[in-house]
């Protein structure tokens, strides 16, 4: 037990990613995309659509980083990714529709256990988000009102 206590005593801050760690992206975005895709007459699986969206988003984020480009906002990469996936799936869209789908990211809910877990951690450690998070998403949905965000 001494080793565990030594490790706990050495922790100075807890850092984690926002998307997929704090908030349930797959479920939330699938719930948001399903009615849109159905209204467009798309017969595919909304969960697969969201997986393509998220994978494309990740790939675009990595390409920006690897090419040492200026920072591209999470929202902008989201717009590019959704438009690409809609195009790939043969779904006609408008830029407003793309914006509406991406805006759902700001309304994602945390995984059920997250608010209590963060509250417990925050009593003992400073919490940080190491992410290209949209700051309003963190404040609104995480249950934590004071945090430091590092991008």
Name each model-derived stretch:
Residues 4-112, 134:
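N-terminal helical cap/lid subdomain that shapes the substrate entry/recognition surface
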Residues 40, 91-95, 115-151:
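Substrate-recognition/cap helix-loop segment adjacent to the acidic, metal-dependent catalytic center
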């Amino acid at each position: 037990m001494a080793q565990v206590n030594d490790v706990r005593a050495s922790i100075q801050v807890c850092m984690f990613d926002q998307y997929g760690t704090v908030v349930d992206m797959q479920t939330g975005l699938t719930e948001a995309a399903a009615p849109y895709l159905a209204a467009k007459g798309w017969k595919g699986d909304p969960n697969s659509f969201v997986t393509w969206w998220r994978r494309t988003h990740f790939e675009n984020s990595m390409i920006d980083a690897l090419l040492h480009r200026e920072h591209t906002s999470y929202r902008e990469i989201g717009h590019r990714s959704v438009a690409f996936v809609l195009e790939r799936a043969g779904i006609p869209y408008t830029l407003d529709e793309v914006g509406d789908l991406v805006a759902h990211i700001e309304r994602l809910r945390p995984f059920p256990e997250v608010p209590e877990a963060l509250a417990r951690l925050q009593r003992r450690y400073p919490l940080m988000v190491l992410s290209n998070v949209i700051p309003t998403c963190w404040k609104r949905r995480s249950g934590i009102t004071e945090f430091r965000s590092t991008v």
